[in-house]
């Protein structure tokens, strides 16, 4: 029940913020022309959750990539789980996704960082999670641990950017390339 309330509040926050947006935001997940060539023919792991949708219709990135015949080996689930069904602080368990049959590995339980054994059958990790920019959210630390594990195990990692839903632009650093 608490997860549902949190999801409703989060959704209202996103809707409220989107009314202030000055234009159409194109997320990293929607830029398939940029990243599909980097993952085709590779074994892909994903760090995604219920915010990892593509387009205006709520189609999950996992489903989108499976339709593109991308070899998704496993999904690493952050706090609240892959489908967003776990309450805040609740341990997320390993398992299989009931919709796709893809293996789900928890990064919010006994281990916060993928192990070498969990990464051995993966060539590249895609990270696509909408963060709200609040310090108490664990998604940014999940990204840090996954980056660390990829570096330690010589795995590629692609972060699909999801800009702040309130249309904030950081003026401290700008990059001329979407790959920087």
Positions of PLM-derived features:
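Glycine-rich oxoanion-binding loops at beta->alpha junctions
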Residues: 93-121
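Conserved small/polar residues in nucleotide/adenosyl-binding loops
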Residues: 173-180
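N-terminal beta-loop-helix "entrance" segment that forms/cooperates
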Residues: 80-98
């Amino acid at each position: 029940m608490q997860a549902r309330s949190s999801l409703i509040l989060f959704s209202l926050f996103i809707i409220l913020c989107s009314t202030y947006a000055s234009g159409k935001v194109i997320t990293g997940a929607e830029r398939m022309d940029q990243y599909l060539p980097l993952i085709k023919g590779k074994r892909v792991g994903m760090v995604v959750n219920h915010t990892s949708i593509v387009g205006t219709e709520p189609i999950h990135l996992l489903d989108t990539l499976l339709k593109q015949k991308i070899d998704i080996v496993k999904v690493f689930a952050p706090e609240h789980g892959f489908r967003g069904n776990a309450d805040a602080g609740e341990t997320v368990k390993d398992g299989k996704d009931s919709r796709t049959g893809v293996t789900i590995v928890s990064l919010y339980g006994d281990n916060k960082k993928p192990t070498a054994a969990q990464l051995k059958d993966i060539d590249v990790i895609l990270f696509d999670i909408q963060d709200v920019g609040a310090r108490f959210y664990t998604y940014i630390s999940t990204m840090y641990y996954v980056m660390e594990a990829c570096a330690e195990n010589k795995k590629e990692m692609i972060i699909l950017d999801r800009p702040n839903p309130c249309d904030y632009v950081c003026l401290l650093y700008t990059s001329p390339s979407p790959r920087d």
